[in-house]
Amino acid sequence: MGMLEVRELLCERDERTLFSGLSFTLNAGEWVQITGSNGAGKTTLLRLLTGLSRPDAGEVLWQGQPLHQVRDSYHQNLLWIGHQPGIKTRLTALENLHFYHRDGDTAQCLEALAQAGLAGFEDIPVNQLSAGQQRRVALARLWLTRATLWILDEPFTAIDVNGVDRLTQRMAQHTEQGGIVILTTHQPLNVAESKIRRISLTQTRAV
């Protein structure tokens, strides 16, 4: 039994089948990239994995239990960062991290922002930051979270090369410590092929 299991998922949108019979199992320490063309259902699949959406058929299990039965404990173990940063634009970068990680002290939050490339921007309201900087505020949570499972939708959008390298290193560290990372990205990952498992949605069944 894996930590996260997908069984025979079916997803239809506007009378079109995005994927059907989709099944896979993820174990501790896995790093997974969901691939496929635009419209293949990558973001839809991520939302199904978070429990934000329900499949038309099939189920997602966490540690052998259907998500709807373990929703609270599952979400305690989940960090989800979608297309939108999901941050409070009227708060500063530092205040955002305090909001999402109330048990993190200021030193930890400042270090997380520095790791994300935001040193010197800690006290600036988020609505005054660029799109890339706002994205970094959300991604700084990767250095604070205790969640086992990270689900990240295009995390490298509007991030420069150095930022992508730092984020990639953080994901590698997380999986080496037994965590799971699931992401979509159009950018090549600068890591050994052997470290990445790819699940393709180029067909109605994942390959």
Swiss-Prot record:
**Cellular compartments annotated:** Cell inner membrane
Q: Which residues bind ATP?
A: G36, S37, N38, G39, A40, G41, K42, T43
Pinpoint the ABC transporter domain residues. Answer: 4-207
Main localization of the protein? membrane
Q: Which SMART domains match?
A: AAA (SM00382)
Q: Name one GO cellular component term.
A: plasma membrane
Looking up SUPFAM superfamilies in the UniProt record yields: P-loop containing nucleoside triphosphate hydrolases
Could you state one GO biological process linked to this protein? Answer: cytochrome complex assembly
**Matching Gene3D superfamilies, A to Z?**
P-loop containing nucleotide triphosphate hydrolases
What Pfam families does the annotation carry? ABC_tran
Catalytic activity annotation: heme b(in) + ATP + H2O = heme b(out) + ADP + phosphate + H(+)
The UniProt keyword set, sorted, is:
ATP-binding, Cell inner membrane, Cell membrane, Cytochrome c-type biogenesis, Membrane, Nucleotide-binding, Translocase, Transport
Protein purpose = Part of the ABC transporter complex CcmAB involved in the biogenesis of c-type cytochromes; once thought to export heme, this seems not to be the case, but its exact role is uncertain. Responsible for energy coupling to the transport system.
Q: What subunit structure does UniProt give? A: The complex is composed of two ATP-binding proteins (CcmA) and two transmembrane proteins (CcmB).
> How is this protein named in the record?
Cytochrome c biogenesis ATP-binding export protein CcmA
Q: Which organism is it from?
A: Escherichia coli O157:H7
* Native organism taxonomy: Bacteria, Pseudomonadati, Pseudomonadota, Gammaproteobacteria, Enterobacterales
Q: Which gene encodes it?
A: ccmA
